[in-house]
Protein backbone atom coordinates (compact mmCIF):
# COMPACT_ATOMS: atom_id res chain seq x y z
CA UNK A 1 0.00 0.00 0.00
CA UNK A 2 1.15 3.53 -0.79
CA UNK A 3 0.18 6.88 0.71
CA UNK A 4 -1.83 7.67 -2.42
CA UNK A 5 -3.97 4.58 -1.83
CA UNK A 6 -5.18 6.29 1.35
CA UNK A 7 -5.70 9.59 -0.41
CA UNK A 8 -2.66 11.17 1.27
CA UNK A 9 -0.47 13.32 -0.98
CA UNK A 10 3.30 13.14 -0.28
CA UNK A 11 5.01 16.46 0.38
CA UNK A 12 8.42 18.06 -0.02
CA UNK A 13 9.72 18.45 3.51
CA UNK A 14 12.02 21.48 3.49
CA UNK A 15 11.35 22.10 7.18
CA UNK A 16 13.66 19.46 8.64
CA UNK A 17 13.40 16.40 10.86
CA UNK A 18 10.19 17.39 12.64
CA UNK A 19 7.83 14.58 13.59
CA UNK A 20 4.75 16.30 12.22
CA UNK A 21 6.24 15.95 8.72
CA UNK A 22 7.55 12.43 9.13
CA UNK A 23 11.12 13.17 10.20
CA UNK A 24 14.25 12.55 8.14
CA UNK A 25 14.64 9.78 5.56
CA UNK A 26 15.50 6.49 7.23
CA UNK A 27 19.13 5.48 6.73
CA UNK A 28 19.28 2.74 4.08
CA UNK A 29 21.21 0.47 6.46
CA UNK A 30 18.59 1.03 9.17
CA UNK A 31 15.85 0.07 6.72
CA UNK A 32 17.69 -3.14 5.88
CA UNK A 33 18.18 -3.89 9.58
CA UNK A 34 14.46 -3.37 10.20
CA UNK A 35 13.57 -5.87 7.48
CA UNK A 36 16.13 -8.39 8.73
CA UNK A 37 14.92 -8.13 12.33
CA UNK A 38 11.37 -8.90 11.23
CA UNK A 39 12.42 -12.34 10.02
CA UNK A 40 13.09 -13.82 13.49
CA UNK A 41 11.85 -13.71 17.07
CA UNK A 42 13.91 -12.67 20.09
CA UNK A 43 13.30 -12.09 23.79
CA UNK A 44 12.92 -8.32 24.10
CA UNK A 45 14.45 -8.18 27.59
CA UNK A 46 17.54 -9.98 26.32
CA UNK A 47 17.68 -7.66 23.32
CA UNK A 48 17.49 -4.54 25.49
CA UNK A 49 20.22 -5.93 27.77
CA UNK A 50 22.45 -6.50 24.74
CA UNK A 51 21.61 -3.01 23.48
CA UNK A 52 22.62 -1.54 26.83
CA UNK A 53 25.95 -3.32 26.70
CA UNK A 54 26.59 -2.09 23.16
CA UNK A 55 25.60 1.48 24.01
CA UNK A 56 27.93 1.34 27.01
CA UNK A 57 30.77 0.27 24.73
CA UNK A 58 30.09 2.88 22.05
CA UNK A 59 29.20 5.82 24.27
CA UNK A 60 31.09 5.05 27.49
CA UNK A 61 27.93 5.26 29.61
CA UNK A 62 26.90 2.84 32.34
CA UNK A 63 23.75 1.71 30.57
CA UNK A 64 21.14 2.59 27.98
CA UNK A 65 17.92 1.47 26.39
CA UNK A 66 15.86 2.09 23.28
CA UNK A 67 12.49 3.76 23.81
CA UNK A 68 9.67 4.68 21.46
CA UNK A 69 10.90 8.26 21.07
CA UNK A 70 12.66 10.91 23.13
CA UNK A 71 9.39 11.87 24.83
CA UNK A 72 8.89 8.24 25.84
CA UNK A 73 12.46 8.21 27.17
CA UNK A 74 11.60 11.24 29.32
CA UNK A 75 8.52 9.51 30.73
CA UNK A 76 10.50 6.36 31.47
CA UNK A 77 13.37 8.34 32.96
CA UNK A 78 10.97 10.22 35.21
CA UNK A 79 9.34 6.97 36.31
CA UNK A 80 12.78 5.60 37.18
CA UNK A 81 13.60 8.66 39.28
CA UNK A 82 10.26 8.54 41.08
CA UNK A 83 10.16 4.80 41.77
CA UNK A 84 13.75 3.61 41.68
CA UNK A 85 13.69 -0.12 42.46
CA UNK A 86 10.70 0.15 44.80
CA UNK A 87 8.05 -2.20 43.39
CA UNK A 88 5.26 -0.57 45.39
CA UNK A 89 6.08 2.82 43.91
CA UNK A 90 6.23 1.34 40.41
CA UNK A 91 2.79 -0.13 41.00
CA UNK A 92 1.23 3.15 42.15
CA UNK A 93 2.58 5.47 39.43
CA UNK A 94 1.31 7.97 38.36
CA UNK A 95 -0.06 8.36 41.90
CA UNK A 96 2.90 9.89 43.75
CA UNK A 97 1.14 11.37 46.77
CA UNK A 98 3.06 9.22 49.27
CA UNK A 99 6.63 9.95 48.18
CA UNK A 100 8.77 12.78 46.73
CA UNK A 101 7.40 13.70 43.33
CA UNK A 102 8.70 17.15 42.35
CA UNK A 103 11.13 17.81 39.52
CA UNK A 104 12.72 21.25 39.40
CA UNK A 105 13.17 23.01 36.07
CA UNK A 106 14.31 26.49 35.06
CA UNK A 107 11.25 28.62 34.35
CA UNK A 108 12.41 29.38 30.80
CA UNK A 109 12.92 25.70 29.96
CA UNK A 110 9.27 24.75 30.38
CA UNK A 111 7.34 23.69 27.29
CA UNK A 112 4.57 21.41 26.09
CA UNK A 113 7.01 18.54 26.44
CA UNK A 114 6.45 18.81 30.21
CA UNK A 115 3.61 16.38 29.53
CA UNK A 116 6.12 13.58 29.03
CA UNK A 117 7.42 14.11 32.56
CA UNK A 118 4.08 14.77 34.24
CA UNK A 119 2.64 11.63 32.63
CA UNK A 120 4.75 9.53 34.99
CA UNK A 121 3.31 11.34 38.01
CA UNK A 122 5.88 14.07 38.53
CA UNK A 123 4.96 17.58 39.55
CA UNK A 124 6.92 20.25 37.68
CA UNK A 125 8.27 23.06 39.84
CA UNK A 126 9.59 26.05 37.88
CA UNK A 127 12.50 27.88 39.48
CA UNK A 128 14.08 31.29 39.01
CA UNK A 129 13.18 34.03 36.56
CA UNK A 130 14.30 35.27 33.16
CA UNK A 131 14.73 39.03 33.31
CA UNK A 132 16.06 39.14 29.75
CA UNK A 133 12.72 38.08 28.29
CA UNK A 134 10.76 40.36 30.61
CA UNK A 135 12.99 43.31 29.73
CA UNK A 136 13.77 43.85 33.39
CA UNK A 137 17.49 43.11 33.22
CA UNK A 138 20.23 40.84 31.93
CA UNK A 139 19.97 37.91 34.37
CA UNK A 140 18.44 34.52 33.77
CA UNK A 141 17.90 31.53 36.07
CA UNK A 142 20.93 30.95 38.28
CA UNK A 143 22.22 27.81 40.07
CA UNK A 144 21.43 29.05 43.58
CA UNK A 145 17.75 29.29 42.64
CA UNK A 146 17.64 25.53 42.12
CA UNK A 147 19.16 24.98 45.56
CA UNK A 148 16.67 27.38 47.14
CA UNK A 149 13.73 25.48 45.65
CA UNK A 150 14.72 22.06 47.00
CA UNK A 151 12.34 20.60 49.61
CA UNK A 152 11.56 17.17 51.05
CA UNK A 153 9.27 16.63 48.08
CA UNK A 154 12.02 17.19 45.50
CA UNK A 155 12.78 13.99 43.58
CA UNK A 156 15.16 15.36 40.97
CA UNK A 157 15.98 18.04 38.42
CA UNK A 158 14.84 18.25 34.79
CA UNK A 159 17.13 20.10 32.39
CA UNK A 160 16.49 20.95 28.73
CA UNK A 161 19.78 21.03 26.83
CA UNK A 162 20.35 23.56 24.04
CA UNK A 163 23.28 25.78 23.15
CA UNK A 164 21.52 28.69 24.83
CA UNK A 165 20.36 26.89 27.99
CA UNK A 166 21.27 28.64 31.23
CA UNK A 167 22.52 27.94 33.81
CA UNK A 168 25.03 25.60 32.21
CA UNK A 169 24.29 21.92 32.74
CA UNK A 170 27.54 21.42 34.66
CA UNK A 171 26.47 24.03 37.21
CA UNK A 172 23.04 22.46 37.65
CA UNK A 173 24.60 19.01 38.08
CA UNK A 174 26.90 20.41 40.75
CA UNK A 175 23.89 21.66 42.75
CA UNK A 176 22.10 18.34 42.27
CA UNK A 177 25.07 16.32 43.50
CA UNK A 178 25.40 18.52 46.57
CA UNK A 179 21.82 17.58 47.48
CA UNK A 180 21.87 13.95 46.34
CA UNK A 181 19.40 14.49 43.51
CA UNK A 182 19.38 12.89 40.04
CA UNK A 183 19.36 15.01 36.88
CA UNK A 184 17.27 14.05 33.83
CA UNK A 185 18.35 15.82 30.63
CA UNK A 186 16.10 16.36 27.61
CA UNK A 187 18.55 16.39 24.69
CA UNK A 188 16.09 15.18 22.06
CA UNK A 189 17.44 17.32 19.23
CA UNK A 190 21.01 17.82 20.42
CA UNK A 191 22.75 15.70 17.82
CA UNK A 192 24.69 16.63 15.84
CA UNK A 193 27.28 16.92 17.20
CA UNK A 194 27.74 13.22 17.91
CA UNK A 195 29.97 14.17 20.84
CA UNK A 196 26.88 15.11 22.85
CA UNK A 197 26.02 11.43 23.14
CA UNK A 198 29.03 11.06 25.42
CA UNK A 199 29.53 14.58 26.74
CA UNK A 200 26.26 15.05 28.61
CA UNK A 201 26.63 11.80 30.53
CA UNK A 202 30.30 12.58 31.17
CA UNK A 203 29.23 15.85 32.79
CA UNK A 204 27.44 13.79 35.42
CA UNK A 205 23.84 13.68 34.19
CA UNK A 206 22.07 10.64 35.61
CA UNK A 207 19.77 10.17 32.62
CA UNK A 208 19.83 11.72 29.14
CA UNK A 209 17.11 11.36 26.49
CA UNK A 210 17.90 11.61 22.76
CA UNK A 211 15.79 11.15 19.65
CA UNK A 212 16.63 8.11 17.55
CA UNK A 213 15.25 9.81 14.47
CA UNK A 214 16.23 13.30 13.31
CA UNK A 215 19.89 13.51 12.23
CA UNK A 216 20.57 9.97 13.46
CA UNK A 217 18.11 8.78 10.79
CA UNK A 218 16.72 5.85 12.71
CA UNK A 219 12.94 5.32 12.93
CA UNK A 220 11.30 8.57 13.98
CA UNK A 221 9.40 6.77 16.75
CA UNK A 222 12.57 5.72 18.59
CA UNK A 223 14.70 7.31 21.27
CA UNK A 224 17.68 6.62 23.50
CA UNK A 225 17.79 6.80 27.28
CA UNK A 226 21.37 6.78 28.55
CA UNK A 227 22.56 6.95 32.13
CA UNK A 228 23.29 5.14 35.34
CA UNK A 229 22.84 1.40 35.52
CA UNK A 230 20.11 1.21 38.16
CA UNK A 231 18.01 4.08 36.83
CA UNK A 232 18.10 2.74 33.27
CA UNK A 233 17.22 -0.68 34.68
CA UNK A 234 14.24 0.78 36.54
CA UNK A 235 13.07 2.48 33.35
CA UNK A 236 13.37 -0.80 31.47
CA UNK A 237 11.39 -2.79 34.04
CA UNK A 238 8.60 -0.22 33.83
CA UNK A 239 8.41 -0.57 30.04
CA UNK A 240 8.81 -4.31 29.43
CA UNK A 241 6.01 -6.82 28.99
CA UNK A 242 6.17 -8.43 32.45
CA UNK A 243 3.66 -11.20 31.74
CA UNK A 244 6.15 -13.94 32.58
CA UNK A 245 5.89 -16.46 35.41
CA UNK A 246 7.48 -15.10 38.61
CA UNK A 247 9.21 -18.42 39.21
CA UNK A 248 10.98 -18.17 35.84
CA UNK A 249 11.94 -14.48 36.02
CA UNK A 250 15.02 -12.93 37.59
CA UNK A 251 15.99 -9.28 37.78
CA UNK A 252 18.70 -8.67 35.15
CA UNK A 253 22.10 -8.59 36.85
CA UNK A 254 23.32 -6.21 34.16
CA UNK A 255 21.26 -3.47 35.85
CA UNK A 256 20.78 -4.56 39.45
CA UNK A 257 22.79 -5.97 42.33
CA UNK A 258 21.48 -8.83 44.46
CA UNK A 259 18.62 -7.63 46.64
CA UNK A 260 17.94 -4.43 44.68
CA UNK A 261 14.68 -5.81 43.28
CA UNK A 262 12.75 -7.91 45.79
CA UNK A 263 10.27 -9.42 43.35
CA UNK A 264 8.85 -9.29 39.87
CA UNK A 265 7.09 -6.02 39.03
CA UNK A 266 3.76 -6.01 37.26
CA UNK A 267 3.25 -4.12 34.02
CA UNK A 268 4.60 -0.63 34.61
CA UNK A 269 3.52 2.84 33.62
CA UNK A 270 5.71 2.61 30.53
CA UNK A 271 4.01 -0.50 29.15
CA UNK A 272 2.31 1.54 26.45
CA UNK A 273 5.67 2.96 25.37
CA UNK A 274 6.93 -0.36 24.04
CA UNK A 275 9.32 -0.44 21.09
CA UNK A 276 9.47 -3.25 18.55
CA UNK A 277 12.46 -5.49 17.91
CA UNK A 278 12.58 -4.13 14.36
CA UNK A 279 12.77 -0.53 15.55
CA UNK A 280 15.44 -1.42 18.10
CA UNK A 281 17.69 -3.00 15.48
CA UNK A 282 17.03 -0.20 13.00
CA UNK A 283 17.97 2.60 15.39
CA UNK A 284 21.03 0.74 16.65
CA UNK A 285 22.17 0.37 13.05
CA UNK A 286 21.50 4.05 12.38
CA UNK A 287 23.48 4.98 15.50
CA UNK A 288 26.38 2.78 14.42
CA UNK A 289 26.48 4.60 11.08
CA UNK A 290 26.06 7.98 12.77
CA UNK A 291 29.14 7.34 14.90
CA UNK A 292 31.33 6.54 11.90
CA UNK A 293 33.87 9.28 10.99
CA UNK A 294 32.45 9.78 7.51
CA UNK A 295 29.13 10.77 9.08
CA UNK A 296 30.45 14.35 9.02
CA UNK A 297 29.89 14.21 5.28
CA UNK A 298 26.15 14.41 5.93
CA UNK A 299 26.45 18.02 7.07
CA UNK A 300 28.62 18.78 4.04
CA UNK A 301 25.98 17.25 1.78
CA UNK A 302 23.27 19.39 3.40
CA UNK A 303 25.43 22.47 2.94
CA UNK A 304 26.04 21.69 -0.74
CA UNK A 305 22.34 21.08 -1.36
CA UNK A 306 21.42 24.41 0.20
CA UNK A 307 24.09 26.14 -1.88
CA UNK A 308 22.47 24.77 -5.03
CA UNK A 309 19.06 26.03 -3.96
CA UNK A 310 20.52 29.38 -2.96
CA UNK A 311 22.30 29.84 -6.29
CA UNK A 312 19.11 29.14 -8.24
CA UNK A 313 17.08 31.56 -6.14
CA UNK A 314 19.77 34.25 -6.29
CA UNK A 315 19.89 33.96 -10.08
CA UNK A 316 16.17 34.78 -10.11
CA UNK A 317 16.66 37.81 -7.86
CA UNK A 318 15.65 36.26 -4.54
CA UNK A 319 17.85 37.15 -1.57
CA UNK A 320 19.09 34.27 0.58
CA UNK A 321 21.54 33.67 3.40
CA UNK A 322 23.16 30.31 4.09
CA UNK A 323 23.72 29.88 7.82
CA UNK A 324 26.40 27.29 8.57
CA UNK A 325 26.81 25.99 12.12
CA UNK A 326 29.92 24.10 13.13
CA UNK A 327 27.99 21.60 15.23
CA UNK A 328 24.49 21.78 13.81
CA UNK A 329 22.57 21.27 10.59
CA UNK A 330 22.98 24.26 8.23
CA UNK A 331 19.96 26.24 7.10
CA UNK A 332 19.03 28.55 4.25
CA UNK A 333 17.11 31.75 5.01
CA UNK A 334 14.99 32.91 2.07
CA UNK A 335 13.96 36.54 2.26
CA UNK A 336 10.47 37.58 1.20
CA UNK A 337 9.87 40.91 -0.51
CA UNK A 338 8.33 43.68 1.58
CA UNK A 339 5.17 43.72 -0.55
CA UNK A 340 4.41 40.08 0.28
CA UNK A 341 3.09 38.45 3.43
CA UNK A 342 5.44 35.63 4.47
CA UNK A 343 2.61 33.75 6.18
CA UNK A 344 0.59 33.80 2.95
CA UNK A 345 3.61 32.62 0.97
CA UNK A 346 4.12 29.78 3.43
CA UNK A 347 0.46 28.78 3.19
CA UNK A 348 0.50 28.93 -0.62
CA UNK A 349 3.54 26.65 -0.69
CA UNK A 350 1.65 24.16 1.46
CA UNK A 351 -1.24 24.26 -1.01
CA UNK A 352 0.91 24.11 -4.14
CA UNK A 353 1.62 21.10 -6.33
CA UNK A 354 3.88 19.60 -5.19
CA UNK A 355 3.07 20.62 -1.64
CA UNK A 356 6.07 22.25 0.07
CA UNK A 357 6.55 22.72 3.81
CA UNK A 358 9.25 25.15 4.93
CA UNK A 359 10.41 26.28 8.35
CA UNK A 360 8.19 28.95 9.91
CA UNK A 361 10.36 30.14 12.82
CA UNK A 362 11.16 33.47 11.12
CA UNK A 363 7.96 34.26 9.23
CA UNK A 364 7.38 37.36 11.32
CA UNK A 365 10.72 38.62 9.97
CA UNK A 366 9.61 37.87 6.38
CA UNK A 367 11.99 34.91 6.11
CA UNK A 368 11.36 31.32 5.05
CA UNK A 369 13.76 28.78 6.56
CA UNK A 370 14.95 25.82 4.48
CA UNK A 371 16.42 22.73 6.16
CA UNK A 372 17.97 20.13 3.85
CA UNK A 373 17.82 17.06 6.10
CA UNK A 374 14.65 15.63 4.54
CA UNK A 375 15.03 16.91 0.97
CA UNK A 376 15.59 14.16 -1.59
CA UNK A 377 17.71 14.74 -4.70
CA UNK A 378 14.70 14.43 -7.01
CA UNK A 379 12.88 17.11 -5.01
CA UNK A 380 15.42 19.90 -5.46
CA UNK A 381 14.20 21.24 -8.80
CA UNK A 382 10.47 21.04 -7.89
CA UNK A 383 11.29 22.81 -4.62
CA UNK A 384 13.11 25.63 -6.40
CA UNK A 385 10.27 25.97 -8.90
CA UNK A 386 7.67 26.11 -6.13
CA UNK A 387 9.61 28.80 -4.25
CA UNK A 388 10.04 30.93 -7.36
CA UNK A 389 6.35 30.58 -8.22
CA UNK A 390 5.36 32.13 -4.88
CA UNK A 391 8.10 34.71 -4.26
CA UNK A 392 7.62 37.75 -6.50
Question: What do the predicted segments below correspond to?
Answer:
Residues 50, 54, 301-308:
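A non-catalytic, amphipathic alpha-helix used as a structural packing/dimerization or gating element
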Residues 2-21, 25, 52-278, 283-288, ...:
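Conserved PLP-enzyme active-site core in the AAT-like
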Residues 19-31, 41-50:
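A structural motif shared across PLP-dependent enzymes of the aminotransferase-like
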Amino acid sequence: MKYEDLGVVPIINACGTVTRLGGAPLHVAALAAYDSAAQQSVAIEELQIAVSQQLSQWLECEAGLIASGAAAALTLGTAAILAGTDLARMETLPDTTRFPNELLIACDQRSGYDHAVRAAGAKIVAVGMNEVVSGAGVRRVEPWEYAAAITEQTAGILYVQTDSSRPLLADVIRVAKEHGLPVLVDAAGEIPPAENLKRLVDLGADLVAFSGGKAMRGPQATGLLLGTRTLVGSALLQMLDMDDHPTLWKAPVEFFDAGDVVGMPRHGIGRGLKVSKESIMAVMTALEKFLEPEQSKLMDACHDLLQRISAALNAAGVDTELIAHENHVPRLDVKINADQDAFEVCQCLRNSSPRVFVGHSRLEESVLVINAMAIRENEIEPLIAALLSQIH
